[in-house]
Amino acid sequence: MENTVQNKPIIELRSLTKSYDTKTIINNFNLTINNGEFLTILGPSGCGKTTVLRLIAGFEELNEGRIILDGEDVTDIPAERRHINTVFQSYALFPHMTIFENVAFGLRMQKVPNADIKPRVMEALRMVRLEEMADRKPTQLSGGQQQRVAIARAVVNKPKVLLLDESLSALDYKLRKEMQNELKALQRQLGITFIFVTHDQEEALTMSDRIIVMNKGTIQQDGSPRDIYEDPKNLFVAKFIGEINIFDAIVIERTDEKTVKANVEGRVCDIHTELTVQPNQKLKILLRPEDIIIEELDENESSKAIIGHVVDRSYKGMTLESSIILDHNKMKVLVSEFFNEDDPHIDHSVGQKVALTWHEGWEVVLDDEDEQ
């Protein structure tokens, strides 16, 4: 029964269209969000992700389409009656009120009996580990603590959905990492659907059950963090999520159902793909820096692999990143290897000749024209 409830749609966005003056921001946008899900909407500035959030919240009016919340059409219902709360980037705390009164504000607006307010506020503050700071003012709290107050205020009236609009972007790196873990743990504890908007790819991968990647008002890919990172469906998603190397390839022939022989940057390679291909067809081969294997070569040594020379290296603690210029076309390739101080060949010298291969089957293969 619990799985059925969890898999039940809590929000359905049906053919949403939103324009400002003559500019269309969202066009025929469709999305189903399940109960208890941590969904992140990810995309560059101006892609329409915040507009989607504001439409769900009821802060913007649709031009076309319907918004369904827990089976009820709320398209024409005002924001304050939607059982949806929002945590903004600015937190929007009242500076003249105590933390307790900030969290209690929404309950008082809803005319909740005074006898019920204190236990509910203290329960919310306990969830975010701030019950001992109930009498302080927001200015007496750190940025991370203010963030937690904003979350407590948002969840105290038990909304069906919590919206978070770039709500970690104002924090420093260390605190942001801590809050990512806390938010995910809190979401599991509450069982509330979280919809999180960000342009930070690492944040999305860390926190989400599911990611929507947007560009120009449309969904480019909808999938788990692992799917989005390891199996991007087009070049936009591949380039937007993390570092990636994109190689040009020309099909020679298909050798079996899952393997194609192709010329990749001047070298004949076997690539794994089930795409329907023809001889001389152009493809793109996508490899993450950690997918690539480096083998050092003597300067006069030959290899059937892709050849290049190390032009830069960067030690990053757990990993060593090497920048390599290919001999074939001067393309720059980024390679990331786990650092092993006992391996004499891991710390490649600038100028070192190298052969590049990759872990079999780790490549992503796309049609050459598949960029959006």
Swiss-Prot record:
Topology versus the membrane, per the UniProt entry? Peripheral membrane protein
Its Gene Ontology molecular function terms? Answer: ABC-type putrescine transporter activity; ATP binding; ATP hydrolysis activity
Pfam families reported in the protein's UniProt record: ABC_tran, TOBE_2
Q: Which positions does UniProt annotate for ATP binding?
A: 43-50
Q: What SMART domains does this protein's entry cite? A: AAA
Report which residue ranges the record marks as coiled coil: none
Identify the keywords attached in UniProt to this record, alphabetized: ATP-binding, Cell inner membrane, Cell membrane, Membrane, Nucleotide-binding, Translocase, Transport
Q: Which Enzyme Commission number(s) are listed?
A: 7.6.2.11
- What reactions does this protein catalyze? ATP + H2O + polyamine-[polyamine-binding protein]Side 1 = ADP + phosphate + polyamineSide 2 + [polyamine-binding protein]Side 1
The portions of this protein that span the membrane are none
Name its cellular compartments: Cell inner membrane
- Record-annotated ABC transporter domain positions: 11-241
One GO CC annotation, please? Answer: ATP-binding cassette (ABC) transporter complex
Please state which protein family the record places this protein in: Belongs to the ABC transporter superfamily. Spermidine/putrescine importer (TC 3.A.1.11.1) family.
SUBUNIT field: The complex is composed of two ATP-binding proteins (PotA), two transmembrane proteins (PotB and PotC) and a solute-binding protein (PotD).
Q: What does this protein do?
A: Part of the ABC transporter complex PotABCD involved in spermidine/putrescine import. Responsible for energy coupling to the transport system.
Protein name per its UniProtKB record: Spermidine/putrescine import ATP-binding protein PotA
**Native species:** Histophilus somni (strain 129Pt) (Haemophilus somnus)
